[in-house]
């Protein structure tokens, strides 16, 4: 655990995808990637962990630790804040800069600069939890174009899959997905499907094929494909995307 002096007028920003107010002072946060459906405005942790924050006193701290770390911004004392990890080495980087932009520039130089996404990926994206039918996708696309509202992307939520966690289109919701994708492309839309990196055992054929090909993450204790309970889709096998052949197979 590391303790730092907490100034009376100090404020903190960062940590990535977190609920609540932008100023992190007076709150505590855990870094532990978690799939939380229908989360509340105070839920923590969530999907993404970025153990980096910036202070209003012109510095940033990046905690380089992959364990279940925790940040406490004055929740235990008015005089200090802290961050901790249950294991691994306590390695962190203190980054000073004249402003937030300079601090971010140094942080990116340390962690690596992300690639610039294609222009369409920076546009407006239509996404909602119930967007899981071909009919609704057409209605939404036509509505945007009819009203002249700019939109570049239409998402299909997890219900596009047959068993909630696999790589097959849900037959009763999508009569001709190939044509739908072509039609939406013709209207100027890109389509992104929501996809977790797992295959539900409910899709017995696909799960057994992935298991036979060795495309699922192995349980180190048994040597068999790891059996992962998932929030939806039941027990699943985790697809090992570090295997180059998996991308072509999926």
List each model region and its residues.
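Catalytic and substrate-binding clefts that recognize carbohydrates or anionic sugar/phosphate headgroups
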Residues: 1-118, 127-129, 134, 141-146, ...
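Aromatic-lined carbohydrate-binding/catalytic grooves of carbohydrate-active enzymes
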Residues: 16, 115-249
